[in-house]
Amino acid sequence: MFRIIKWLIALPVGIFIFFNAYVYGNIITYRAVAPHQTAFMSMRMKQFEQEGRDVALDYRWMPYNRISVNLKKALIASEDARFAGHGGFDWGGIQNAIRRNRNSGKVKAGGSTISQQLAKNLFLNESRSYIRKGEEAAITAMMEAVTDKDRIFELYLNSIEWHYGVFGAEAASRYFYQIPAAKLTKQQAAKLTARVPAPLYYADHPKSKRLRNKTNIVLRRMGSAELPESDTD
């Protein structure tokens, strides 16, 4: 009996250690190498297949300096205004999210920073639970410890979901505007950014009033967006 209890304790601990070692190894690799495909992309494409959707993956890696500053500012203004200065976590946002979750009785709001969103995109799925948020936090801490802000943002820009099968700034720019990501205007960048919280909803509701309103909000906030140091020169 005691041996069984030991195994019941040791097995999940071993899985946890192995998973985090795997993640850390990939984080080190991704400092210099572009991901072939993220866990979220794989999950999403499998979901489309199960739903009987004929969707092809459109994912085109683009270096950081070949992505429009307009898009960078729009995303920071919308998703994580304190990105340039925090260590991966927006504690005020997390506290607000916890309060909203308590009030609703469910894990809805996440208070996720760009770094946390990237952790989810690279290694996790879209399930919502406190265990998954804990995994996300651990990955975020590891990533922030060994990866500079420009690289974190570059990985994020290239892994965002924008439409059915469309991932990354370059694929989105080509899909919606038939131009490279480097040439996105402020208006185009704001429109793309407005889709980020719910890309598949807006894919099905392209004339949504919420999408127009969010675009205008992003446009107003872009001027005060603070980019990582290398983009401020």
Q: Can you annotate each of these PLM segments?
A:
Residues M1-D233:
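Juxtamembrane regions of bacterial inner-membrane/periplasmic proteins
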